[in-house]
Amino acid sequence: MSGAVLVAIAAAVGNLLQGWDNATIAGAVLYIKKEFNLESNPSVEGLIVAMSLIGATLITTCSGGVADWLGRRPMLILSSILYFVGSLVMLWSPNVYVLLLGRLLDGFGVGLVVTLVPIYISETAPPEIRGLLNTLPQFTGSGGMFLSYCMVFGMSLMPSPSWRLMLGVLFIPSLVFFFLTVFFLPESPRWLVSKGRMLEAKRVLQRLRGREDVSGEMALLVEGLGIGGETTIEEYIIGPADEVTDDHDIAVDKDQIKLYGAEEGLSWVARPVKGGSTMSVLSRHGSTMSRRQGSLIDPLVTLFGSVHEKMPDTGSMRSALFPHFGSMFSVGGNQPRHEDWDEENLVGEGEDYPSDHGDDSEDDLHSPLISRQTTSMEKDMPHTAHGTLSTFRHGSQVQGAQGEGAGSMGIGGGWQVAWKWTEREDESGQKEEGFPGSRRGSIVSLPGGDGTGEADFVQASALVSQPALYSKDLLKEHTIGPAMVHPSETTKGSIWHDLHDPGVKRALVVGVGLQILQQFSGINGVLYYTPQILEQAGVGILLSNMGISSSSASLLISALTTFVMLPAIAVAMRLMDLSGRRTLLLTTIPILIASLLVLVISNLVHMNSIVHAVLSTVSVVLYFCFFVMGFGPAPNILCSEIFPTRVRGICIAICALTFWICDIIVTYSLPVLLKSIGLAGVFGMYAIVCCISWVFVFIKVPETKGMPLEVITEFFSVGARQAEAAKNE
């Protein structure tokens, strides 16, 4: 686990450089315009500041596709080189044109970092701390701004401040970032798997997780390569084997899955329910809140919510279902505690899959499973390294005459992956290992109370899909999972065709929508207004009495502004995986609205200057703190989680391009808006956008905390089909 943390910290150094650059140009431009006489030519002054935005926008148009082609690590190395070269060019800068070139190169580096660091961290982080690690870029970016403002403020106190030195000092941290990317950062294991480089991916995962056994996660990565596979939600009834009767409208006995508990003589069965629809499953297992909200809520949000919702009777978290691995059960009710459950017999024919061994193998695989087991038992049980509360046994109790056994592995965040293998005899009578079985179905350890009672029967829902297959020949040793087709085969074909997949389109709506609303929520306007606010609060007079010039005072004020963000971001890092992304957004956006409305009122109503300064200062501080807790990091975190591996780079590039275009629009429209509708009008407009943002998050943005990336993308696929089905009804 420490390996993933250190790798995320190293990658987030790139965002420190971004924040560093943003702050240094804000201070250096005060001296640049004096040297080049730009007071009468504000367009050139604005171009110097904006050239970094232009460079970031240009590079973003191709960064995602190239990252999917060449890898994440080479692009991060390139960004460090661009930072380094750009800083040296700015340090030299004999004229404005060379300075513009240096700013453009620097912008290229910024664009690559903003696009790729969230992808890289998401693809290397374990699910249980992915939110924390993906908040690091926000923290290091703000930290870089604070350090840079302090440096520029110190230089501004010199008799002859050098703007070239202010900008050129960037080459030192950029050189550090270069060495980190070249000698410390590994390639993303998910990208390696997508290219069929399995041994490299396995070694990287072993380093990131700090353990040798990463087979479960390797299987997960392969299973997550497909896009748009047919996945269905099925309903099951689980109960004691001798008590399940026809009264529960269950299928015939041949369809049952038999389970064995740890207690001798105790067995249970899971049987499919006839006629259970996807939407009926959601209505039973979804939250009571979503039922009250009616049809406005996206079914996708309800589906994700069912994973995290607490079961009211037992206090346990709902176990959830999962893709490409067959059946996975969502269970509530009283069950024997601390039991491990294994499959005994699975009936129901699976589909045939081609094998790269040729036509001599006609076996299919037993559907594997991913399950989430988060119950009230968590309080009583020690945490494992990867947060798994219950596990499957690698050797089944029922392994016997048929040569069947069950295997299972943790994949982080309390999730497990498991499948069943069979042994068969070849022509000479020798047993052949590793051939998948011919039937599908799987079951998970059940949460619950202290024993069986009246509530022996429980409802269960399963997300069932067909697996993406590959062969053990990929590793030339033990198999990683039940698959037969080389992973690189799944990445062939048109990327643009995959963008039309309903699940991908739904994810793009969420990602692009968040980026647009974030930029129009007012952060640039509040940053622009902050020096004026603090001046009114008397900070400027206090600093001038200390002998600090107005230019130096503005830099110090900006440093103080960024400093107050850091504790708030630290709190967000803690809450991102506890409360969740959606919850943080829904909680913090109302405070942004209130802060903006107070700023509107303070600028419309005539009041005592001291009262005005206090209200404005408190509002600005609250706005900054709660913005960086929610709307600052959450959009990038969510965008890095909701797209399939095959198109993750290009989809995040689309989201990042939206970010930069909106950033440019907001930056250049702000002076015009201030002149036309005034400060109160601008903040009022931002407050309206924040209200729209809250509604958008409430209706469209699901909770993704603690879920493996491959599970998230499969949920988007299922949710999109559910939404289409709901429209057609």
UniProtKB/Swiss-Prot annotation:
Sorted alphabetically, the Gene Ontology cellular component annotations on this record are: Golgi apparatus; plant-type vacuole; plant-type vacuole membrane; plasma membrane
Spans annotated as Disordered: 347-367, 423-442
Identify a single GO molecular function assigned to this protein: transmembrane transporter activity
Biased composition of type Acidic residues is found at 347-363
Q: Name one GO biological process term.
A: response to cold
Compositional bias (Basic and acidic residues) at which positions? 423-434
Give the Pfam families listed for this entry: Sugar_tr
Is Methyltransferase found in the keyword set? Answer: no
Domain of life assignment: Eukaryota
Any idea where this protein resides? Vacuole membrane
According to UniProt, the reaction catalysed is: D-glucose(out) + H(+)(in) = D-glucose(in) + H(+)(out); sucrose(out) + H(+)(in) = sucrose(in) + H(+)(out)
**Modification type Phosphoserine: residues:** 438
Keywords, ordered alphabetically: Membrane, Phosphoprotein, Sugar transport, Transmembrane, Transmembrane helix, Transport, Vacuole
Per the record, membrane topology reads: Multi-pass membrane protein
Q: Respond yes or no to whether keyword Transmembrane helix is given for this record.
A: yes
> Major place of localization?
membrane
Task: Explain the consequences of disrupting this gene.
Answer: Reduced accumulation of glucose and fructose during cold adaptation. Plants lacking both MSSP1 and MSSP2 have reduced fresh weight when grown on high glucose containing medium or in response to cold stress, and exhibit increased glucose cytosolic concentrations leading to the stimulation of mitochondrial respiration. In triple knockout plants missing MSSP1, MSSP2 and MSSP3, reduced accumulation of glucose and fructose during cold adaptation.
The tissues in which it is expressed are: Mostly expressed in roots and stems, and, to a lower extent, in juvenile and adult leaves, and in flower tissues.
Q: What induces it?
A: Induced by drought, salt, cold and sugars (e.g. glucose, fructose and sucrose).
- Residue ranges annotated as transmembrane are 1-21, 47-67, 81-101, 104-124, 139-159, 165-185, 507-527, 553-573, 585-605, 610-630, 650-670, 679-699
Primary role = Sugar proton-coupled antiporter which contributes to vacuolar sugar import (e.g. monosaccharides including glucose, sucrose and fructose), particularly during stress responses (e.g. in response to cold).
| Family note | Belongs to the major facilitator superfamily. Sugar transporter (TC 2.A.1.1) family.
Q: What is this protein called?
A: Monosaccharide-sensing protein 2
- The scientific name of the source species is Arabidopsis thaliana
